[in-house]
Amino acid sequence: MHIAVIGSGYVGLVTGACFAEFGVDVTCVDVDDQKIERLLNGVMPIYEPGLEHLVAKNTQAGRLRFTTDVRQAVEQALVIFLAVGTPPLPDGSPDLSYVDSAAASVAQYMNGYKVVVTKSTVPIGTGERIRSLINERKKTRANFGVVSNPEFLREGAAINDFMRPDRVVIGSRDEEAIAIMKDLYRPLYLIEAPFVITSLEAAELTKYAANAFLATKVSFINEIANLCDKIGCDVHDVARGIGMDKRIGSKFLHPGPGFGGSCFPKDTRALSSVARQFGNESLIVDAVIEVNRRQSSEMFAKIGKLVGPLEGKKIAVLGLAFKPETDDMREAPAIGIIQHLTESGATVTAYDPVAKDEAVKVLPDISYADDEYDAVAGADALVFVTEWNQFRALDMTRVRDLMKSPKVADLRNIYEPEDMREMGFEYVGVGR
């Protein structure tokens, strides 16, 4: 089977590389000729553990190709994945212009039966929108099926998530398209991955609902953490106490500076927008969004209480990406926190193991260190924002001795409060 993936960003590249690893013949297409040129030279446009190796392996094997030639890719493919961006508009709804453009390309070059699959996160009704657009613009009488096959990839663990998914959601009313999709995912039968076969609309809503629910857990535990700060108890004890309940589960009950990235902020706002379009209030989702917005200010207040007046102070920030094992700076909590610090007159020196190049684009006016110890030298305070594993193994005695003032705001609760205080640090965590 030959498939085409239109869009070679995070979702498209991981999807293409993983299907190629399954043995499928894959062509990844992108209108960005510089991105395609870099991919042809083995240079990844994103950081994702294991992806560079997977791309190189399957490119060398001849199963994975990159091109800007949409026509050739569409004409050769039986299944065409649309994995283009859906950035938010000012009202929170997704911009579908890239999806429309990709669907128009499929219509223009359709030369036989095709399965057109939305891999991008799209609002309810997009599948039918694509069907109508292709029907209006196709130049042949060829039939086609439309499928919603949302991705549930975690940045930093995307390859494992694709290869060993919790479930595969396939939404369509076309039985032939469903059969082809099942065949495409046949390698997953060996690990008995469950399949959810449903309507286009239910599949589209499933993606939004899943991310909104996970975001709800994050905002909930952050509210509990803020309450723990006032009460004087440890949020981790509370999280363990509720997380052991099988109805709740322990995942996503980790307090911190709030959620960021390409999914949770965008998808919660999009779900709220969709609800309004259908005349429905989304009270819980709206509250989740507000709690997350407020959390950045809560973290800044925590730093201010620790440090005092920030004018002229040097603050070291460790961790910039929205989570470990990625260079993704989209809506990263570090952005708002650092902007608060600099607006208050502090100077910021930051370090992140992989996100510097992306961080410079959104935070061009701060200093960037070569390593953790370079960042903390002469600092009036250290702020942990992203919980990279290497930050858990720092020589904290050396860190203390390098700092001007041994004050730590640990926004990811990487270290134990008592241990830090015994070492001579003035330490604050989140909900501890």
Q: Model-derived features: where do they sit?
A:
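Structural/interface elements that position substrates and couple domains in central-metabolism enzymes
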Residues: 1-432
